């Protein structure tokens, strides 16, 4: 069987103990949000299959964790080579299933391979062995894998974000149960096929496809030692409550944000507008780091920036992800998501928000929406929630500190940014803003994989899916070791050995 034949569509939806199996749970499907075509159908995993996958992962753990790091890295690097070899297929699969423009889908695959190299480096630098001499012995700090861990992936980056958990978990010696979003099963299936071709031993990575019932069966199973989650704040909070009484399980959460972007004085109006658009509307606004709230001063410079933002936003090209002339963004993940953004806008309008550019669902039943900008300066207080799409709320302000206070008026704390020519303004902003990612004169959707990624408050509890992922994929073990037992030269007071 050649490689292309191995990558043909499957009728089996689950990968358990090295075997492709049909699911035994409810049927579900994946729909291309750009044209409404059903591109994948299958049965989800039931509770029995979840149990079987965990049993398989537990059995594989002892062999996998006993392998040398070098041996594990050979397989991880082989997966990276598979990604490079099938990069275009992977990118087209992402675009087909998510509606994301092909140019951006290609960057996602590139980020996946880059993340592998960073994960290898992070494991060496953050979880290596430290040896210190002491009288009559040696003291060691080593790291051990947790065991069997679950990875829950999101739909917005269905390859890159699960990859950011799976790769460091495997490098550390864990075995993994991968539960992807039910909206992107086709990308998950391809991911698993490439791991299979890379030579991953049976049971080390198991794929469990399905909807809510599958996820609940996995998250609540006593046989897992931890769960790594990227997704909505609501689901993450439910997981946090569920795991509150289980201190023995590691829980890493990377969730959303109600992210602020503040402007003070910027001479380069065009560049400021570019960074605002990149912050708010990239990926149809479906990035957890996207700007949701824009603070613009009531100044002539602020007026100029807002005016150009409106004219430039109105010209944003959206369309078919595979169009020869590529759009800035394609469709949202689903018709439901698109309709949800229309409703969110209506709710804000009802609270007194004034639409400067109306967000519209282009075609009923599909995921295309035009970007929207709504002035909420004089609106009633709004709910602190993440609107996961291309809708930007504008606040006009006269006092910088008051703008920062309002930017911090959220339970979230993922990303924040300042566009300002003044470094003094930035230092003032940096000291006061609450966020795990803080940028100056750069889009707030930009983050380095070589740095921590994540937030505070309702945005998460670990720096997931980046350099610091090595920290939650293994735990430190302190040891004092000697070649033989020995009697000390002097005994403690009151102690006699005879």
From Swiss-Prot:
EC class: oxidoreductase
Active site feature: 254, 288
One Pfam family here: Aldedh
Keywords, sorted A to Z: Arginine metabolism, NAD, Oxidoreductase
CDD domains named in the record: ALDH_SGSD_AstD
Pathway: Amino-acid degradation; L-arginine degradation via AST pathway; L-glutamate and succinate from L-arginine: step 4/5
UniProt-listed Enzyme Commission number(s): 1.2.1.71
Family annotation (PROSITE patterns): ALDEHYDE_DEHYDR_CYS, ALDEHYDE_DEHYDR_GLU
Annotated InterPro entries: Ald_DH/histidinol_DH, Ald_DH_C, Ald_DH_CS_CYS, Ald_DH_CS_GLU, Ald_DH_N, Aldehyde_DH_dom, SuccinylGlu_semiald_DH_AstD
Record-linked SUPFAM superfamilies: ALDH-like
The protein's role, per its UniProt record: Catalyzes the NAD-dependent reduction of succinylglutamate semialdehyde into succinylglutamate.
Protein name: N-succinylglutamate 5-semialdehyde dehydrogenase 1
Organism: Shewanella denitrificans (strain OS217 / ATCC BAA-1090 / DSM 15013)
